[in-house]
A protein has these predicted regions:
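C-terminal catalytic/acceptor-binding lobe
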Residues: 222-318
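Conserved nucleotide-sugar donor-binding
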Residues: 88-89, 198-221
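A conserved hydrophobic helix/loop-capping motif in glycosyltransferases and polysaccharide synthases
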Residues: 7-21
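Short, well-formed alpha-helical segments that are part of the catalytic scaffolds
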Residues: 17-33
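Short beta-strand-to-loop acidic/aromatic patch adjacent to the donor-nucleotide binding site
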Residues: 89-99
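Short, flexible, basic/aromatic active-site loop/helix in glycosyltransferases
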Residues: 142-199
Length: 318
């Protein structure tokens, strides 16, 4: 196993995405020094060999290596594939929308991972619960009762965010909705494997973990959105497995401060305040940033329950 220098920085590049996403990520690397040495690897999902070679040439100044994956499965499965091939000492995984916001961002994550007793670190975490949401949306007893808007309005707010993420491409929007609906149909069969609120989980948009620890976890194949839900926020999620090993799962803010799972809400990184503590942004944090008061209240309560504390813009579309 390679144990040299800094972490292996793995960025998920999808051929199906807007190419500006990869360009924006590379520009962030140029503009915001990571604060530590790193090995950059593009996990190139759905690229042909010719397309991959062209992309790597275009980004030659940031010195990336590339590994091509078929356009199937979801992000976590690709990350596990990279780790299996490279076997580096530690990794920082970023999804396609990952956008570092401050200088020294990678050094802050890496320093947190090296703290005694820490097993996994992330730029954001959440307590949001899919089972509690499903119960609430069906007018059943739920921890969200009295905290979220009435179910019809809450469902409309979620749908608006999904459509926003899909963009103006109607086909992409339809595909996104079909994937979401299929996952929701499958979830009742998996409900016992998911956690009710508070379902502590580090979000996998930007996280770090060592290879040795990754090998100790039970990692199933990620074929569907349901598989991804289970690994990110289920009873046997990455976060829960790490915690059961007696290791901390922490969120790191832009100042480098570290928060254990009981205090993630104080980090001001995800759907809280103005997200002023956020170290690495993504499309979900952007949905909150651009949202009006109604959306911000909904997202903050969904993630943090009674500890929700959104900053509400005076005038902004919801």
């Amino acid at each position: 196993m390679d144990t040299g220098g800094g972490p292996c920085l793995v960025y998920l590049a999808r051929a199906a995405n807007d190419p500006d996403l990869v360009r924006a990520f590379a520009e962030n690397l140029r503009r915001l020094p990571a604060g530590t040495d790193y090995e950059l690897v593009l996990a190139m999902k759905g690229f042909s060999v010719v397309e991959a070679e062209r992309q790597l040439r275009d980004l030659a100044d940031v010195n990336p290596a590339g590994i091509i994956f078929a356009d199937e499965g979801l992000d976590l499965g690709v990350y596990f594939g990279v780790a299996a091939q490279l076997q580096r000492e530690r990794y920082c995984f970023l999804n396609s929308y990952g956008a570092p916001l401050v200088e020294g961002w990678l050094e802050k994550l890496d320093a947190a991972l090296k703290l005694p007793g820490v097993g996994m670190v992330g730029a954001t975490g959440s307590w949001a619960s899919i089972p509690s949401w499903l119960a609430y949306s069906r007018h059943l007893p739920s921890a969200y009762r009295g905290l979220l808007p009435e179910p019809r309005v809450a469902r409309q707010l979620r749908l608006a965010i999904e459509l926003e993420h899909a963009g103006t491409d109607k086909r992409a929007a339809a595909d996104a909705l079909r994937t979401r609906l299929r996952a929701l149909r499958e979830l009742p069969d998996q409900i016992t494997h998911l956690q009710r609120f508070p379902a502590h989980h580090l979000r996998t948009n930007a996280f770090m973990i060592t290879h040795d620890l990754l090998q100790r976890l039970r990692l199933h194949v990620v074929h569907s959105k349901t598989d991804a839900y289970l690994l990110e926020s289920g009873r046997n999620s990455l976060t829960r497995q790490v915690q059961r090993l007696g290791l901390a799962t922490v969120v790191v803010d832009r100042a480098g401060a570290v928060y254990d799972h009981e205090y993630w809400d104080r980090s001001q990184t995800l759907w809280q305040g103005d997200q002023e503590g956020l170290l690495v942004a993504d499309n979900q944090t952007l949905a909150y940033e651009r949202g009006g008061a109604e959306r911000r209240r909904f997202l903050s309560a969904y993630a943090w329950g009674q500890r929700a504390n959104p900053s509400l813009p005076s005038k902004h579309p919801s």
